[in-house]
């Protein structure tokens, strides 16, 4: 099949996802993109800008069987701006995130127009794909709350139709070579996330202070992209843990990033927001033992091993790290490491890409709003069962 993929924010996880799928797919792909910056402006103009790219591709002979777009594009607008050859294609919207439940520091900062654009895009799609069941459920619940607040014509009844057309299709990761046995030394702790408040880095550093006070030796790698408004705790932590730090900051070289993951023992998350957690999946595939708060998408993805979780506070995280340190290189440690690798193997592209290829092939154009798209009854959600 010939697939037209539109990625209005072509950077970070959005780029990595599409690159991984297309490399492992049996379909033929045309990928049209816009740079991954200024997300609000991208959401405003993406339909117009990409429709012009599409017309140019059609002029060069482009023809497609399916349309695949991300949540950063208003599909309803795009259908209106494109010729029938594209406007009438069966279409999937993939939700990496959404603008109703994506975190903001202050509730007054949320522009509900972008969330409503997500709604219109979903209505225009034949299927909605989410990276986790947690994401699907929280989005649809928030959408229903939003629509019931409208003064009239809220169209709340359409939310149940969207749920029927929603599938869980987690992002894939590359297969990981055997890293061999662990080298000697202190416990190696990894934290990899955006350096923003919704990842709660302060919880990590408060927990590490407690670990240090208990006399547990550790090495530390703190990775991730930083922005203009950097939480103050990073500068404080860099000074406090300067003797323990091995890696600090954003790593744009994939080989170096993989090497850091391969030598780490624990992958710690302190997130208060996470729709999937690709960094955790990659670290687990490398043999890191996940240390996760018992919330968000994590229980859905890693709940088969209770010892991967802590209660969510800095004290509970410190307790979990110290408990794992006492098990370093024991039989239980090796069991946990093997379980992490096993659970993450569900997300290998070699497994997920064929399943998503199949699902895309079974997407049909709905003729009437509210009519469920026909399919084969199997989805990429099976990969996480």
Name each model-derived stretch.
Residues 232-255:
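Nucleotide-activated donor-binding/catalytic signature segment of Leloir-type glycosyltransferases, i.e.
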Residues 170-199, 205-212, 220-223:
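Conserved donor-binding/catalytic core segment of Leloir-type glycosyltransferases
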Residues 272:
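Aromatic "clamp/platform" in nucleotide-sugar-dependent glycosyltransferases that forms part
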Residues 123-178:
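Donor nucleotide-sugar binding/catalytic pocket of nucleotide-sugar-dependent glycosyltransferases
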Residues 289-292:
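Short hydrophobic beta-strand element within catalytic cores of glycosyltransferases
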Residues 258-264:
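Short alpha-helical donor nucleotide-sugar binding micro-motif in glycosyltransferases
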Residues 41-45, 329-365:
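A charged, aromatic-enriched C-terminal amphipathic alpha-helix characteristic of glycosyltransferases
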């Amino acid at each position: 099949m010939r697939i037209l993929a539109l990625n209005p924010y072509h950077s970070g996880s959005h780029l990595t996802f599409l690159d991984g799928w297309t490399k492992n797919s049996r379909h033929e792909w045309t990928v049209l993109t816009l740079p991954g910056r200024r997300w609000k402006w991208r959401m405003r103009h993406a339909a117009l800008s990409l429709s012009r790219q599409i017309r140019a591709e059609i002029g060069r002979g482009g023809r497609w069987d399916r349309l695949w777009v991300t949540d950063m594009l208003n599909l309803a607008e795009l259908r209106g701006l494109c010729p029938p050859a594209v406007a009438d294609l069966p279409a999937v919207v993939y939700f990496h995130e959404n603008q109703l439940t994506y975190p903001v520091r202050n509730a007054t900062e949320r522009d509900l127009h972008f969330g409503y654009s997500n709604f219109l895009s979903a209505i225009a799609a034949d299927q909605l794909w989410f990276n986790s069941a947690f994401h699907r459920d929280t989005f649809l619940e928030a959408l229903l709350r939003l629509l019931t607040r409208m003064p009239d014509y809220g169209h709340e009844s359409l939310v149940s139709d969207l749920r029927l057309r929603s599938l869980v299709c987690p992002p894939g990761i590359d297969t990981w070579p055997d890293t061999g046995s662990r080298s000697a030394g202190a416990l190696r702790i990894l934290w990899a996330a955006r350096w923003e408040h919704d990842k709660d880095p302060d919880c990590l550093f408060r927990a590490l202070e407690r670990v240090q006070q208990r006399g547990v030796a550790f090495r530390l790698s703190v990775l991730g992209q930083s922005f203009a408004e950097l939480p103050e705790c990073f500068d404080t932590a860099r000074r406090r843990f300067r003797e323990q730090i091995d890696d600090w900051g954003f790593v744009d070289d994939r080989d170096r990033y993989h090497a850091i993951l391969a030598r780490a023992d624990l992958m710690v998350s302190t997130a208060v927001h996470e729709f999937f957690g690709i960094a955790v999946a990659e670290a687990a595939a490398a043999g890191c033992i996940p240390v996760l708060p018992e919330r968000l998408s994590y229980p859905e993805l890693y709940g088969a091993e209770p010892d991967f979780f802590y209660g969510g506070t800095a004290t509970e995280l410190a307790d979990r790290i110290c408990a794992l340190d006492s098990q370093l290189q024991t039989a239980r440690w090796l069991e946990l490491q093997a379980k992490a690798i096993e659970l993450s193997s569900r997300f290998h592209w070699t497994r997920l890409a064929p399943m998503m290829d199949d699902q895309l092939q079974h997407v049909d154009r709905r003729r009437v709003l509210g009519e469920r798209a026909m399919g084969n009854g199997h989805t990429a959600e099976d990969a996480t069962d």
